[in-house]
Regions:
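Conserved mixed alpha/beta catalytic, RNA-binding, or beta-rich assembly cores of soluble enzyme
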Residues: 71, 79-86, 120
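Intrinsically disordered, low-complexity segments enriched in small/flexible residues
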Residues: 1-59, 63, 211-296, 300-308, ...
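Flexible beta-alpha connector loops of hexameric P-loop NTPases
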Residues: 74-81, 113-116, 306-314, 346-354
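A structural preference for long, well-packed, hydrophobic secondary-structure segments
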Residues: 129, 303-333, 351, 357-369, ...
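Glycine-rich, charged/polar anion/phosphate-binding loops
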Residues: 50-53, 282-285, 319-320, 357-358, ...
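Conserved acidic
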Residues: 74, 78, 206, 311, ...
Length: 492
């Protein structure tokens, strides 16, 4: 594994000649002449005065604070001086309203300084959370290796966390763990690719692509909100369409899915993988998105065959991560509903699926940022309900919402699935029915069917959602929340 130096990070990622150091000469604690000699040798070997470099810079023209670990200085270990430097950098970034790009590379706490150095993890974490509480973006790029106290503080608190390919990332380095416990971890457990698959980090990106990723993220997170969109009235929407025809239309394999929506309508999309705490489920997509004039957090279901797309408890916890992220970054939320239903397995029941649905609905219904839910296709039961609460809801002309798939409702009422079409009609599942009952604010036309005009339809659906958000972002928060509450309270 080739280790990435501080110089390589600065020269590859930052705009040329824009880095300005914030560092002052470190004040080192007195742990005797042996430690002083170690520090002197580390400085001589690395040409650095501590294990971290901080400063201000531009990335793609965006002003940022930069914090980069230096493994060449005592294995990037964090003592009192390095921890103070990190803390001061976060505090300055917060005071100046700057996003932070941090790139840890560290063996952990500096053992020469013992417990006092270990306890500095607390103040670093406090400074990071104060920065996040100010609504400022925090991007993390983990380099090989990142372990111990660095990973367990500033390395794990980013809004977006990605890592170098093949990087060793873990709480305890493999050599120390094997000495302590007598056996190693299985091969690959502490590698960045494994952590991405498990939902601990958001992805794996080589250094040469980090600048592009950072610029995209900064564009989403710092660009002004000037949404543009298009409104559609109900005139021309067929009211005599059989509900079962809409069900069949949404199950057409050629019908656009979430990834088509993003491809045709998003200017930037940065996926966020998993919960960040070790769970990952691909049935829910969460990401930072830039639509024309509007940045948002998008949370959506990407319709696939039932066996691949049923909603699990972990998927709902992934969605909840998106809610929290939107609130912290003060970004609107757009949800996309298109699901065959919840996971119906022993694992889902034991995993608390019903409780996660309740918590997801409650969280989305009360989140303080503007929310628009979009019904792209199938709205099957509680899987749809989980992403439905919103200030405004737009629905594709063939979109629908039902407490169960019509076949399931038919099985309950008629003890056969053969009456599914009758149940679809009886349950008032169509977009026009949802509009009439107040569950939908606008129907987006399909001309004549989304499967026949995927690009145009996707752009219309997002134009409708962003037009709704243009009105919502202009409203005072408390007024908007009151209207949202009253909307569902008064629904008949």
């Amino acid at each position: 594994m080739t280790r990435i130096s501080v110089h390589e990070v600065i020269s590859t990622v930052l705009d040329p000649d824009t880095f300005s150091s914030w560092d002052t000469p470190p004040v080192q604690p007195d742990y005797g002449p042996q430690y002083a000699a170690q520090l002197a040798r580390a400085t001589q070997r690395s040409s650095a005065d501590e294990a971290v470099v901080t400063g201000g810079a531009l990335i793609g023209g965006y002003r940022v604070a930069v914090i980069v670990g230096d493994f060449d200085f005592l294995a990037g270990s964090l003592g009192a001086a390095a921890s103070e430097r990190i803390t001061l950098a976060f505090e300055r970034a917060t005071a100046e309203g700057l996003p932070v790009l941090a790139s840890p590379m560290s063996g952990g706490t500096r053992m020469q300084e013992g417990t006092p150095a270990f306890l500095h993890m607390i103040k670093i974490s406090q400074a990071v959370l104060a920065h996040r509480a100010a609504g400022l973006p925090y991007l993390v790029y983990l380099r090989d290796p990142t372990t111990g106290g660095a990973l367990a503080s500033w390395g794990s608190l980013g809004h977006l966390t990605i890592a170098q390919p093949g990087a060793l990332v873990g709480l305890l380095g493999p050599r120390v763990r094997e000495i302590m416990l007598g056996e190693p971890l299985p091969e690959g457990v502490q590698r960045s690719e494994s952590l991405a698959r498990k939902g601990v980090i958001d992805g794996v990106v080589p250094l040469r692509e980090l600048r592009t990723t950072a610029v995209k993220a900064l564009r989403v997170l710092t660009s002004p909100q000037e949404p543009v969109g298009e409104r559609f009235d109900a005139e021309g929407i067929a009211t005599d369409r059989a509900p079962w025809d809409s069900v069949q239309a949404t199950r057409n394999p050629e019908r656009p899915r979430l990834h088509h929506l993003l491809h045709h309508a998003a200017e930037v999309f940065i996926p966020l993988r998993g919960t960040g705490t070790g769970e990952s489920d691909g049935t829910i997509t969460v990401g930072l998105v830039r639509f024309p004039g509007l940045s948002c957090v998008l949370i959506g279901q990407d319709r696939r065959p039932r066996r691949d797309a049923s909603l699990s408890p972990a998927a709902l916890r992934v969605a909840q991560r998106g809610f929290h992220l939107a609130e912290e970054l003060d970004l609107p939320l757009v949800t996309v509903i298109d699901s065959p239903g919840p996971e119906l397995t022993t694992e889902a029941e034991h995993g608390g699926l019903a409780g996660e649905i309740a918590r997801t609905v409650a969280a989305l219904a009360t989140v303080r940022v503007p929310v628009v839910s979009t019904i792209l296709g199938e709205g099957n039961g509680v899987a749809a309900l989980a992403l439905l609460p919103a200030d405004r809801t737009v629905c594709a002309e063939n979109g629908w919402v039902a407490p169960l798939p019509p076949e399931g409702a038919s099985a309950i009422i008629h003890r056969t699935a053969d009456r599914a079409a009758d149940m679809a009609a009886a349950h008032r599942i169509r977009a026009v029915d949802l509009l009439e009952m107040g569950a939908v604010n606008e129907i987006v036309p399909e001309r004549p069917d989304a499967a026949e005009e995927p690009a145009e339809f996707c752009r219309r659906l997002i134009a409708s959602a962003t037009a709704q958000l243009a009105e919502l972002v202009a409203m005072k928060t408390e007024e908007r929340l009151r209207i949202r509450h009253d909307r569902y309270r008064s629904m008949t």
